[in-house]
Amino acid sequence: MYKNIIFDFGGVVVNFNPRDFLMDHFMNHRAEEETYDIVFGSQEWQDLDRGIITREEANKIMLEKAAHANRVFEVQTCLDEWFTMLETNKTTVQIMRKLKAAGYRLYYLTNIPTDVMDELRQREWFSLFDGGIASCDVHLCKPEPEIFTTLMQTCHLAYDESIFVDDNKANAQAAYNLGITGILYKNPKSFTRALGACGIEVE
């Protein structure tokens, strides 16, 4: 019997689609790909998630790379405006409220930089969570098994009583490999169906 639902943030609770963001801003495939590699696909972005580099340090390195690639305008625009992507997925939050009202405990497990985590903590839906782990706080990232076990131990969760929801297949698979039921999030409708398959009705 499931008691705990564990949520990723980006792509699940808040919108996060860097490639769409870049396409909307530049509409130039080469510029989009090069900017993606310098920013979202970079080692610095991974280090931000892991909490081992500051935003200022990461931005400095990214802009140095941008100068070599002649992409300073694109990268600076991206660094200035990417936060606007992080709009709350209101339908997912509605599902979360229904789950909470039905007695399920909600947790988060997210790869996220410190400054983004600080901002999301201020959103009204954050109080729905009973606990969770942010990668920047423990210097671990999904899909590493250690971040899952850290969450389960810290929050005293039973593996067979927990469902993990993520928009990244590798992360959902990592949870499954540890004995946690994994749901690959695509949209609220498919998420609701997947919950139903687990015996959880939220309609």
Regions found by a protein language model. Name each.
Residues 8-11, 51, 99, 108, ...:
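Generic structural signal for small/hydrophobic residues in well-ordered secondary structure
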Residues 4, 141-169:
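Conserved Lys-Pro-Asp/Glu-containing loop-to-beta segment of HAD-superfamily phosphomonoesterases
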Residues 122-136, 200:
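Structural recognition of alpha->loop->beta junctions
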Residues 93-101, 152, 172, 176:
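Surface-exposed amphipathic alpha-helices with a cationic face
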Residues 159-196:
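Acidic, Mg2+-coordinating phosphoryl-transfer loop and its flanking beta/alpha structural elements
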Residues 46-78:
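A metal-dependent, Asp-based hydrolase signature
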Residues 1-41, 193:
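Active-site neighborhood of HAD-like aspartate-dependent phosphohydrolases
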Residues 73-107, 145:
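Short, acidic loop-to-helix structural element flanking the phosphoryl-transfer center
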